[in-house]
Amino acid sequence: MRIADYSVTKAVLERHGFTFKKSFGQNFLTDTNILQKIVNTAEINKNVNVIEIGPGIGALTEFLAENASEVMAFEIDERLVPILEDTLRDHDNVKVINEDVLKADLQTRVKEFENPDLPIKVVANLPYYITTPILMHLIESKIPFSEFVVMMQKEVADRISAEPNTKAYGSLSIAVQYYMTTKVAFAVPRTVFVPAPNVDSAILKMTRRKQPLVEVKDEDFFFRVSKASFLHRRKTLWNNLTSHFGKSEEVKNKLDQALENAAIKPSIRGEALSISDFARLSDALREAGL
């Protein structure tokens, strides 16, 4: 019997008198086939360390522990710590940390692995309400995570992996794809969770690039420009950029010059620009003194 078997999950929750907290976005997976698929997608083996976020009662953790060298699981809900100690008592390669991963000192934590030189993969069933902040926090951290295999709301997975000229493409697609290659591995129906969420989920696989997808002179400015370009999706690039940088004649002249230098039409919409277009645009805007 597995922790993720519905009857086991139910028994564990009842034994510990656990009640779900909406504020933590808790939905526990009760499908062993999907858990095995997650481990297969992440290609977990004994030469890999894993960081898991939001282990819940340990359904995914159990599969990870059987396959990985070590698992470090961050759980924000202190009520789940004794439950995890119970459900994972047979696995001595799991360390449960009762901490908000957004506040954790990950640089120090990863040194606590017994073999800290092994590649680190992030495998997680992320709370939907905080998926993007956690993801960006991990991607932008200096920890050399080689890969992320993450369960998230399907709509967010589609946005992250979207291509230009699609409805889902936006600043989030650019922010993640700048650092990572992305692929939606498979969809997960809402019916396999307790309690069932209001949305369908997907597993997104992200692999860190050896270097960012494009070269830019100022990363922060590049992300600022891409965000500004999607401020109002139906508006032109020109309208969004003037909303962001200002509408004075001086600013308009600089914008004109920058767009011309970047060979980008002001009448285009942000969603039509590729990531390399945004790199060219942000460098040109920076050179123009904006």
From Swiss-Prot:
Its EC number is 2.1.1.182. GO terms for molecular function: 16S rRNA (adenine(1518)-N(6)/adenine(1519)-N(6))-dimethyltransferase activity; RNA binding. CDD domains: AdoMet_MTases. S-adenosyl-L-methionine binds at residues 27, 29, 54, 75, 100, 125. InterPro entries: KsgA/Erm, rRNA_Ade_diMease-like_C, rRNA_Ade_Mease_Trfase_CS, rRNA_Ade_methylase_Trfase_N, rRNA_adenine_dimethylase, SAM-dependent_MTases_sf. GO terms for cellular component: cytosol. It is found in: Cytoplasm. It holds the Pfam family RrnaAD. It catalyses: adenosine(1518)/adenosine(1519) in 16S rRNA + 4 S-adenosyl-L-methionine = N(6)-dimethyladenosine(1518)/N(6)-dimethyladenosine(1519) in 16S rRNA + 4 S-adenosyl-L-homocysteine + 4 H(+). Signal peptide: none annotated. Specifically dimethylates two adjacent adenosines (A1518 and A1519) in the loop of a conserved hairpin near the 3'-end of 16S rRNA in the 30S particle. May play a critical role in biogenesis of 30S subunits. Belongs to the class I-like SAM-binding methyltransferase superfamily. rRNA adenine N(6)-methyltransferase family. RsmA subfamily. NCBIfam families: ksgA (TIGR00755). HAMAP family: 16SrRNA_methyltr_A (MF_00607). This is Ribosomal RNA small subunit methyltransferase A. It comes from Streptococcus thermophilus (strain ATCC BAA-491 / LMD-9). The gene is rsmA.
